[in-house]
């Protein structure tokens, strides 16, 4: 088993704290062990640029906004059922993503793939604030794409095997639109 009760990482620009408890049996297809993990912190733009230069990402490092990337993750479960109780990413003042839900049958043997296909039931919320700095770094002109401040997208994604269902409620300014989509890739 892997057990990291408290792990901290810091640079002048970033800070991450984590705890992990992982019995090896949690990684088996019908695992009985329970993984518990918690990660929280922020990654500064200078550190992101350093990593991107190490992986030879070309001009992509220039697109990173100056705001730090804030992260939070709390997950419990095993390969049969993993619960995401808190999963957040935020570029302060620009956008925030919040995801919660359940993922099922992450690892399968060939016999159980048809009787217990991989599945998920996930709720999400994406909130846009001032996107102009990020869009300009990406080379997108204001006239090409405009995301009004306060725009939000809330919805749900359900998946079972190759069958997908999704909903989204988009609110921007004084308007809104509700969307639904389904597909089966079989």
Regions found by a protein language model. Name each.
Residues 1, 6-9, 16-41, 69-80, ...:
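Extended lipid/amphipathic-ligand handling interfaces
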Residues 44-52:
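Outer-membrane beta-barrel translocator/channel fold
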Residues 57-61, 139-142:
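Extracellular loop and loop/strand-boundary signature of outer-membrane beta-barrel proteins
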Residues 65-66:
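Short acidic/polar N-terminal linker immediately downstream of export determinants
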Residues 124-126:
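Intrinsically disordered, low-complexity segments enriched in glycine and mixed charged residues
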Residues 135:
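Extracellular/lumenal and peripheral-membrane lipid-interaction modules
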């Amino acid at each position: 088993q892997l057990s990291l009760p408290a792990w901290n990482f810091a640079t002048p620009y970033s800070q991450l704290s984590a705890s992990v408890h992982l019995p090896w049996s949690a990684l088996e297809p019908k695992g009985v062990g329970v993984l518990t993990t918690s990660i929280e912190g922020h990654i500064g733009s200078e550190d992101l640029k350093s990593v991107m230069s190490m992986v030879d990402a070309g001009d992509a490092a220039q697109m990173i906004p100056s705001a730090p990337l804030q992260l939070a993750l709390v997950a419990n479960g095993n390969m049969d059922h993993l619960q995401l109780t808190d999963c957040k990413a935020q570029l302060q003042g620009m956008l925030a993503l919040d995801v919660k839900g359940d993922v099922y049958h992450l690892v399968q043997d060939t016999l159980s793939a048809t009787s217990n296909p991989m599945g998920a039931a996930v709720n999400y919320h994406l909130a846009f604030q001032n996107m102009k700095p990020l869009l300009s770094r990406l080379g997108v002109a204001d006239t090409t794409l405009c995301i009004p401040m306060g725009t939000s997208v809330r919805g749900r994604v359900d998946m079972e095997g190759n069958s997908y269902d999704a909903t989204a409620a988009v609110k921007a300014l004084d308007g809104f639109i509700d969307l639904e989509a389904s597909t089966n890739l079989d």
